[in-house]
Design a protein with these regions (language model features):
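Signature of N-terminal electron-transfer/Fe-S-associated modules in redox systems
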Residues: 1-154
């Protein structure tokens, strides 16, 4: 049975079983490669996307569960240029290997949408489910603080 999804403000109809992981639909059906497969168990955060503004692990979310909700991937985070979090990521040279970055950025964007001026503790709590094998955590925190001002002024 075809499922109608709203992904990055566009409607897409996909013909997959409703228990298919959202990550596979995004990557293999819709050709949106930003969200990455890391662990397949929802613990690394590389596959994080937004569903109605909430950060979710797309490897553990069935596509049928997001019908009627807005899915945003890194490709759709800011269609008119860089989102403030993306700009701050560049400014603070956060990426090294880059594998985790889409998930990190999506989690940070969700945090700033609900907590415009987070403390270090709030950042650490929100980002704790996103692993970075390169260890750029201090730069991630700095970038989120930098982006907070830009997001609040948007």
């Amino acid at each position: 049975m075809p499922l109608k999804l709203k992904v990055n403000d566009a409607v897409a109809t996909v013909d997959v079983p409703p228990d298919t992981p959202l990550l596979w639909v995004l990557r293999d059906v819709l050709n949106l490669k930003g969200a990455k497969y890391g662990c397949g168990m929802g613990v690394c955060g590389a596959c994080t996307v937004l569903v109605d503004g909430r950060a979710v692990r797309s490897c553990m979310t069935h596509v049928g569960a997001v019908v009627g909700q807005a899915v945003t991937t890194i490709e759709g985070l800011s269609p008119d240029g860089l989102h403030p979090v993306q700009a701050a990521w560049e400014s603070f040279d956060v990426p090294q290997c880059g594998y985790c970055q889409a998930g990190q950025i999506m989690t940070a964007a969700a945090l700033l949408a609900r907590t415009p001026h987070p403390t270090d503790a709030e950042i650490d709590t929100a980002m704790s489910g996103n692993l970075c094998r390169c260890g750029t955590y201090p730069r991630i925190r700095q970038a989120i603080h930098e982006a907070a001002g830009a997001v609040a002024n948007k």
